[in-house]
């Protein structure tokens, strides 16, 4: 480098000197003044905090239908963040269309066809192919997408932000012609109607000291309520762990109902949102939370609208201070259903699961103690406080106490959310769903989402509840029940599940990232290499960071065990 100044003349436009300082051109992508003005107009008076990055990316995506490189650069400038930070977050989430300078923006209209197991059984693949054949690709973009939480109306798709249930080519064309791409808002119980039935009286009694936190906690423990997001941890015990930590403390609500086959949270929120909201405020009071955050999946636009309207009504009513409850909008990442990944996303980052310990009750949101609850759990907390523990512990079947909200879909006559005793068997659930479709014979079932795998019809007497399925290599999870018939292949269902895991792996750990990809390739073959698949499954279970990779092999193992003739 002794003659660096002379040699560097050959590389004009890179360096001014041989010391790596002073560029002829600005470092990185140049700032576009028009893009900056557009971003500033969209953000308005909103705070420029890093934890709001995903919210601000949504503003750009909603306004322009994509996020250009110049808008990313402008957003980074406006938020005083590096371009790399903004880019890595924007490209992590499936609902952000990041476009480089050399790429053309996508068509103005996007159709996302659900490819979950329930929709696949209902002909989603054929529907997608027909739409691709019939519609102009320059005007409409057609994508496959994971479960949208509408398995009871399969096949379903999303046109803009509007869902079309029982979708056909004709109904989609009609919707496109109408130009209506916004979600219809269902009839629901608003604040005034909820108050008229005694709503928020339980919260008032707790706030005024008529009922102590210990009393409420003991009532929950007596009821037997356990977390209904899938893990099943006793709900009341969580409060003690969080209260034991020094404040400020937060509540984070996991509304990212992304487990395929699950739609119970949406069912309750689109009908009785204030049962959930009262339960949230009771839990927040119990841990003396400084603020509450609700992380809601982007696939539920009607729910997002309802929560926005009703939280504003609660603020106007004096129930809560302004901005005490913040709703954060997901962006299409199943991994954010894992509690620590959800917290990362609320903080405006990629949804990568954290290593534990520490646990989120000790060091969660913004490194503070955080109480994490599921939507349905909070729904039941409010009901128990209003009606007493007997609404759960007073119901018993097959030696199990309580009630379960089963999301039922597949080859049944009347799919939907079925509130049944927790000791119900798959036969009870099929009966509640109107029985099998005509011409279909019960063959197999998914008891609790793809992570629970597939069980054969011969195992039809097991109560579908916490702790009853582990002996069979499965678990109840979110109680997402999909029923298969003799018209279906178990191996195809398992492949659908593993393709989902392959798509949704966050990529942080090799066993999950590579394991899911390799498993799909092996399962696509006519004959499965069962020894290699078992070795792969063992590595994924033992070495994956979070529950996604640890549970992903369940469909493989259960098909090998119960349906060997198919593989």
Walk through the language-model features, giving the residues of each.
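Histidine-anchored nucleotide/phosphate-binding helix
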Residues: 93, 272-286
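Short helix/loop capping segments that flank catalytic or ligand/cofactor-binding pockets
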Residues: 121-122, 129, 173-175, 203-204, ...
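Accessory "access/gating" subregions that flank catalytic or transport cores
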Residues: 206-245, 393, 407-408, 419, ...
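Short amphipathic, charge-patterned alpha-helical segments
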Residues: 279-281, 422-439
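Hydrophobic alpha-helical positions that pack around
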Residues: 304-422, 434-437
């Amino acid at each position: 480098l002794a003659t660096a100044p002379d040699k560097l003349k050959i590389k004009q436009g890179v360096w001014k000197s041989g010391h790596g300082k002073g560029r002829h051109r600005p470092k990185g992508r140049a700032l576009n003044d028009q893009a900056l003005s557009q971003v500033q107009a969209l953000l308005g008076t909103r705070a420029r905090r890093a934890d709001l990055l995903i919210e601000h990316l949504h503003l750009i995506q909603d306004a322009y239908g994509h996020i250009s490189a110049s808008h990313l650069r402008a957003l980074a400038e406006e938020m005083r963040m590096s371009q790399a930070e903004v880019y890595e977050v924007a490209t992590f989430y499936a609902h952000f269309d990041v476009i480089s300078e050399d790429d053309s923006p996508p068509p103005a209209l996007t159709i996302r066809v659900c490819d979950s197991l329930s929709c696949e059984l209902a002909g989603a693949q054929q529907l997608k192919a027909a739409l691709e054949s019939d519609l102009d690709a320059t005007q409409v973009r057609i994508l496959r997408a994971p479960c949208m939480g509408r398995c009871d109306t399969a096949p379903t798709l999303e046109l803009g932000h509007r869902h079309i249930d029982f979708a056909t080519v004709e109904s989609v064309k009609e919707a496109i012609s109408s130009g209506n791409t916004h979600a219809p808002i269902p009839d629901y119980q608003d604040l005034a109607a909820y108050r008229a039935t005694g709503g928020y009286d339980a919260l008032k009694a707790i706030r005024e000291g008529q009922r102590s936190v210990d009393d409420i906690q003991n009532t929950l423990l007596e009821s037997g309520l356990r977390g209904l997001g899938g893990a099943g941890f006793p709900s009341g015990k969580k409060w003690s762990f969080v209260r034991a930590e020094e404040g400020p403390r937060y509540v984070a609500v996991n509304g990212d109902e992304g487990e395929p086959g699950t739609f119970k949270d949406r069912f309750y929120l689109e009908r009785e949102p204030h049962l959930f909201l009262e339960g949230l405020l009771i839990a927040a009071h119990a841990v003396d939370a400084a603020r509450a955050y609700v992380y809601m999946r982007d696939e539920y636009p009607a729910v997002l609208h309802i929560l926005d309207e009703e939280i504003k009504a609660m603020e106007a009513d004096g129930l809560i201070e302004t901005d005490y409850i913040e709703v954060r909008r997901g962006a299409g990442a199943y991994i954010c259903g894992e509690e620590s990944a959800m917290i990362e996303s609320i903080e405006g980052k990629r949804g990568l699961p954290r290593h534990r310990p520490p646990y989120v009750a000790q060091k969660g949101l913004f490194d503070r103690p955080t109480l994490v609850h599921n939507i349905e759990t909070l729904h039941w907390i409010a009901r128990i406080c209003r009606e007493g523990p007997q609404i759960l512990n007073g119901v018993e079947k097959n030696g199990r106490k309580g009630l379960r909200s089963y999301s039922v879909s597949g080859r049944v006559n009347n799919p939907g959310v079925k509130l049944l005793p927790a000791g119900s068997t798959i036969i009870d659930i099929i009966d509640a769903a109107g029985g099998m479709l005509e011409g279909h014979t019960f063959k197999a079932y998914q008891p609790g989402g793809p992570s629970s795998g597939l069980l054969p019809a011969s195992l039809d007497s097991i109560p579908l509840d916490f702790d009853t399925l582990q002996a069979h290599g499965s678990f109840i999870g979110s109680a997402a029940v999909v029923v298969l018939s003799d018209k279906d292949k178990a191996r195809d269902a398992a492949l659908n599940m593993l393709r989902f895991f392959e798509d949704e792996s966050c990529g942080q750990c090799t066993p999950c990232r590579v394991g899911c990809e390799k498993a799909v390739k092996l399962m696509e073959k006519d004959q499965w290499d069962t020894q290699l698949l078992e070795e792969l499954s063992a590595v994924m279970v033992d070495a994956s960071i979070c529950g996604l990779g640890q549970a992903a092999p369940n469909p493989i193992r259960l098909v090998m065990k119960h349906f060997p003739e198919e593989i």
